[in-house]
């Protein structure tokens, strides 16, 4: 699979084009790697190397000159700087230093944390060129083989094996489109991989979205870890459907529900479909028309009881609410203290639903700590968040997720939930959308995700 990705190897060495012994040695290593199927990006400039490492996010490996770096502070900073920019988005990218045995043993302590990120030190003048090239190739292959997240990896593997499509969809991996001029134009525009990977649920090695098995289950579990959830479910028809799944799994006719007046229309559809009785939470609004948050006192037991008493459909009922839904962030971009809402509703509500359609990035930067649904497990309600992954992360249109955080008192009944899930999810899911959810989750994993959010802060 590694050759299919066509990720090049970056070599940064001041003698890469020079008529020196070191230059000749580095060029021989590059030639050996090219014979092994790798493309090489060579540069003799440390500054250019840093630019490539920071902007080319499709590298298989980096080789960087480090001869004399232990005694030369400028050379050492070149190496350290390249390591830092490369690892910002690719924490597992293998980076080798090129030099002699004594290259970095005299480096100062403050540089050692970065130098310890090196995969290894290649001794240019002690080992043979084929041996050195094999060291690099093995590290690059290992990195690329482990790069893809589980479902996307399985989809790429299945498509790359050139399997025939003996099932739906009817275009048969794109073959049908090639049978007419307009279809041929469609095929050329979208490309063969897009069409060959448009598959049916009849491919068992890809798992089942409806049963949450195989690589799809692994992808959902990995996304749950990345977003801080106990359970995550991929949704292929947007957060409007994700919201309806949550409600149909948790709410029954005549249940009391607390509803943010500033909610999406899918919440209103959910009320109609379930037959629940809404009690509305009124958000604030300033003189400019900007919608602010719901005041905290709206969530108090006394306020909830007052809403019940004022509603002719609920008068006389106990103040026990099945589900509360809050739009977080608001449509004007203001976010709630989610943990405070959880605690305030702990004795009043069974299920708390944060509609975070425009807020899927919050889990990946400390700036938002405490202000998103999956942040902290609290006593009281079972917590759902619904994310329009396609709106603010890198995913195809309609790609959404449902995240669930169990509380100490309430855990998700997965079997019951899945009945509602299967009610709303197509039995012919679009695998490109699912793969984009898997990739969106993997992109935000670890320090790479934080760096993406920090970049938006810096640009703002």
Positions of the model-derived regions?
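Conserved acidic segment of CheY-like receiver
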Residues: 2-33, 41-42, 62, 96, ...
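N-terminal "arm"/small-domain region of PLP-dependent enzymes with the aminotransferase-like
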Residues: 126-213
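Conserved PLP-enzyme active-site core in the AAT-like
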Residues: 43-46, 84, 108, 245-252, ...
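Conserved N-terminal alpha-helix of the aminotransferase class I/II PLP-enzyme fold
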Residues: 192-241
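Conserved phosphotransfer microenvironments
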Residues: 21-27, 46-49, 58-90, 100-108
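Short alpha-helical segment
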Residues: 47-52, 241-242
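Short beta-alpha junction loops
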Residues: 15-17, 68, 97-105, 127-128, ...
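Output/docking surface of receiver
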Residues: 44, 99-135
């Amino acid at each position: 699979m590694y050759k299919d990705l066509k990720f090049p190897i970056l070599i940064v060495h001041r003698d890469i084009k020079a008529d020196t012994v070191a230059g000749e040695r580095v060029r021989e290593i590059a030639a050996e790697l090219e014979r092994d199927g790798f493309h090489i990006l060579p540069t003799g400039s440390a500054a250019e190397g840093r630019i490539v490492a920071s902007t080319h996010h499709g590298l298989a490996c980096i080789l960087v000159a480090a001869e004399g770096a232990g005694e030369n502070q400028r050379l050492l900073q070149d190496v350290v700087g390249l390591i830092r920019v490369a690892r910002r988005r690719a924490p597992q990218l293998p980076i080798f230093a090129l030099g002699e045995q004594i290259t970095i043993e005299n480096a100062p302590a403050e540089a050692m944390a970065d130098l310890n990120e090196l995969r290894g030190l290649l001794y240019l003048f002690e080992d043979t060129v084929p041996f050195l090239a094999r060291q690099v190739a093995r590290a690059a292959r290992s990195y690329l083989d482990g790069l893809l997240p589980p479902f996307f990896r399985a989809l790429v593997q299945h498509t790359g094996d050139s399997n025939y499509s003996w099932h739906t969809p009817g275009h048969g991996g794109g073959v049908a489109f090639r049978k007419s001029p307009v279809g041929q134009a469609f095929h050329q525009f979208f490309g063969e991989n897009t069409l060959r990977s448009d598959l049916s649920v009849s491919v068992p090695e890809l798992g089942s979205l409806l049963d949450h098995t195989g690589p799809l289950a692994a992808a959902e579990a990995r996304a749950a870890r990345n977003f801080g959830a106990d359970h995550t479910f991929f949704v292929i028809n947007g957060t409007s459907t994700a919201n309806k799944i949550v409600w149909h799994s948790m709410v029954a006719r005549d249940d009391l529900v607390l509803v943010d007046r500033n909610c999406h229309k899918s919440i209103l559809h959910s009320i109609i479909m379930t037959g629940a009785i809404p009690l509305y939470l009124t958000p604030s609004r300033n003189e400019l028309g900007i919608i602010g948050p719901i005041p905290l006192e709206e969530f108090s037991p006394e306020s909830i009881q007052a809403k019940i008493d004022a509603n002719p459909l609920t008068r006389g009922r106990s103040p026990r609410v099945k589900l509360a839904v809050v739009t977080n962030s608001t449509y004007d971009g203001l976010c709630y203290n989610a943990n405070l809402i959880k605690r305030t509703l702990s004795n009043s509500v069974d299920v708390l639903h944060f509609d975070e359609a425009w807020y899927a990035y919050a889990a990946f930067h400390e700036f938002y700590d405490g202000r998103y649904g999956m942040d902290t497990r609290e006593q009281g309600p079972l917590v759902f968040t619904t994310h329009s992954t396609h709106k603010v992360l890198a995913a195809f249109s309609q790609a959404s997720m449902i995240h669930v955080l169990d509380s100490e008192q309430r855990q998700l009944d997965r079997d019951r939930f899945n009945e509602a899930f299967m009610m709303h999810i197509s039995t012919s899911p679009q695998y490109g959308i699912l793969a984009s959810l898997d990739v969106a989750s993997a992109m935000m994993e670890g320090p790479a995700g934080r760096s993406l959010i920090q970049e938006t802060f810096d640009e703002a």
